[in-house]
Amino acid sequence: TPDTAYFTLDGMFKQQLYETATNLTVNHIINYNYHSEWKIPIAPEAYRRDLKLFGDQYSNFNAGKILLYLEGFAGLDYSIPDDNLTIIPSFPDEWDWMELRLPIKNSWTRIRYNHDEVVVENSPLRVIKKQRID
C-alpha cells in the first residue's frame, strides 16, 4: 500500500540508508506514481485491478510522497527556533539536477542540486550542508 511504502522508505532515509532508499523511492514513483500518458508523477487514491485510476484524483490523496522528495531526495531538515536549514542531498543518480522553491518565513528560498554542488539562495535560515554517508 502507499502508506506502507512511504513509512518503509522514510525509515530508510532516517536510518541513513541513502543509496538504497533513493533507488527504491525512484522505483516506487515510477511503478506506482508515474502516469505514462501524462508524463508526470501522480498521487491517486488507488488503482483498480486493471490498473485504471480509482477514486479521488484531485486532492492528491497519496501526496505523502512529497516528503520523500523534500526530506529524502532533497535531504531537508529545518528548525525555525534554531534558525537552521540542514541539507543532506540524496537525489537520484539518474537525474542531472533538481530544484526546489520553498516558502520559509517571509521569503522564497531556492535550492538547486546537481551532482557537484547544492546552491541555496535567499534563505532566511542559516544553511548547514552535509555530505551523505552511504
Can you name each region flagged by the protein language model?
Residues T1-I66, G72-D77:
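Active-site core of glycosidic bond-cleaving carbohydrate-active enzymes
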Residues Q15, Y47-D134:
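Carbohydrate-active enzyme catalytic cores, enriched for enzymes
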